[in-house]
Regions:
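Conserved, well-ordered active-site substructure
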Residues: 261-283, 331-386, 390-391, 396-435
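Active-site-adjacent helix-turn-beta-strand microarchitecture at beta-sheet edges
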Residues: 251-333
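Proline-rich, Ser/Thr-phosphoregulated intrinsically disordered regulatory regions in large mammalian
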Residues: 3, 8-10
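Beta-strand-turn-beta hairpins that frame and shape the catalytic cleft
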Residues: 206, 218, 288, 350-357
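Zymogen propeptides
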Residues: 2-3, 15-275, 279-280
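Short, solvent-exposed aromatic-acidic interface loops
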Residues: 226-231, 296-298, 361-365
Length: 435
């Protein structure tokens, strides 16, 4: 028997070796590179052109100083750097370079080339404050170029932007998405002392004409009596009186000569008191509205005391009160104005300081309804006004802008009346075109 090695190969065929390779790691999807902004690219250039030489210069200076100190005995004091002026120059250079880098970054961010950030004086020019003298019988003439007219509320956006300084942070009821009466126009006026915009809306199938006004000075909110004096029996159209006194916007007043009703105050003097149930509106010399209710002031002296206490300029005697301190006022009875019946209406509203709306409600075109006082008050309160008061309605209810009648009075024509309220420019003849 032959010798067989202990580890002799088996007769079983050997399977070929399998070459195993490590699985390739799964590659995560790379994130797309974020596009670098213009400011970022400029900042990189600034780093390369300015900061790299600065750092190189600093490194060389530091290396030179280290070489000077090599081999110096430990106990030896470190010598004072001889040329301190060079380091001062270096510090100044670095400070200047950093300042230039910061300025360059600001310029690139603003998309400017040679301009720096505008100063407050450049963006908000100082404006002169105008006032109408107390003894002036008429106001300055408006500048014709300051009037304008558009069809779409959106077209008023640049006008509202230019009026921001005179609005002084106050919001307007008029908005660029306002729903206006079909086929109507939006009229406006803007100069250095007054902004006014007039338009029409439809509410409860009545056409409401709004004129929103913001003035710079209380002297621009005025009352005019026919012939410029108390007690005149002469009567004029609203458009005629508005043109006489150079009104930007005017509204019929309380028709004081037609009714012996309420307290009449003109030029700070109590003239007449009649009708114990009357609610009276007073305008003080700051341009703010005040109210008295029926029975609160019953004599001329009592009215004069009220005038002196509140520094009242003039009054309006019709009513009733619609909104008092943002609260809707309800009435079940009032002596004038047929409050529970449909009637053409007019009102004066105060939105904020030196900020007003005059409004009428009439029938126009297919819209042939006219409101009760309750309906009228509801729509007036929706403007967000602080105070609101009914003026004489019916055929008297009229609003005039640029000497043109804007609304459609009863029977389609104005009535001759004895007084108006109006808003005027205070800029001396000619005004300033800010439109």
């Amino acid at each position: 028997m032959g010798y067989k090695p202990k580890y002799a190969a088996s007769s079983r065929k050997r399977e070929p070796d399998v070459i195993r390779t490590k699985p390739e790691p799964e590659k995560k999807p790379s994130r797309p590179k974020k596009a670098q902004s213009k400011a970022g690219r400029i900042f990189q250039i600034i780093l390369t052109v300015i900061l790299v030489p600065v750092c190189t210069f600093a490194s060389v200076r530091l290396l030179g100083w280290m070489l000077e100190t090599v081999g110096r005995p430990k106990a030896a004091p470190v010598a004072k750097i001889k040329n301190m002026g060079a380091l001062d120059d270096f510090d100044a250079y670095v400070e200047q370079a950093m300042s230039q880098a910061d300025s360059g970054l600001k310029v690139s961010h603003l998309g400017l080339t040679e301009q720096t950030e505008p100063t407050q004086e450049e963006t908000e020019p100082v404006r002169q404050h105008y006032t109408i003298p107390a003894d002036a019988l008429v106001a300055p003439k408006p500048n014709p170029s300051c009037y304008g007219q558009v069809v779409s509320p959106a077209e008023m956006e640049p006008i509202l932007k230019n009026a921001k300084w005179i609005l002084d942070g106050q919001k307007t009821y008029f908005q660029t998405n306002q729903q206006i009466y079909e086929d109507s126009f939006i009229r406006y006026y803007l100069d250095d002392s007054i902004f006014a915009v007039t338009w029409q809306e439809v509410h409860d199938d009545s056409v409401y004409t709004f004129s929103e006004i913001k003035v710079e000075d209380a002297s621009q909110f005025r009352r005019h009596l026919a012939d410029g004096q108390y007690g005149s029996d002469t009567q004029y159209l609203t458009t005629e009186m508005a043109e006489t006194v150079n009104a930007v916007v005017a509204s019929a007043g309380d028709f004081y000569r037609f009714r012996n009703f309420g307290a009449v105050v003109y030029q700070g003097e109590a003239r007449r008191v009649e009708g114990t149930y009357a609610e009276t509106c007073y305008i003080d010399r700051n341009g703010d509205m005040h109210f008295t209710r029926g029975g609160e002031v019953l004599t001329t002296q009592a009215v004069q005391d009220y005038v002196d206490e509140h520094d009242i300029n003039f009054s309006l005697a019709f009513g009733p009160i619609l909104v008092d301190n943002y609260e809707l006022v309800e009435h079940t009875w009032y002596g004038v104005g047929e409050i529970t019946e449909g009637y053409a209406r007019a009102a004066l509203c105060q939105m904020d300081s030196l900020h007003y709306i005059v409004v009428t409600a009439n029938t126009t075109g297919p819209h042939q309804s006219i409101p009760t006082v309750a309906q009228f008050a509801k729509n007036i309160a929706a403007t967000g006004c602080r105070m609101a008061y009914c003026l004489d309605g019916g055929q008297t209810a009229s609003i005039v802008m640029n000497n043109d009648l804007v609304n459609r009075p009863v029977y389609g024509q104005q009535r001759k009346i004895s007084d108006i309220i109006y808003f005027a420019t205070a800029v001396p003849e000619g005004g300033t075109d800010n439109g």
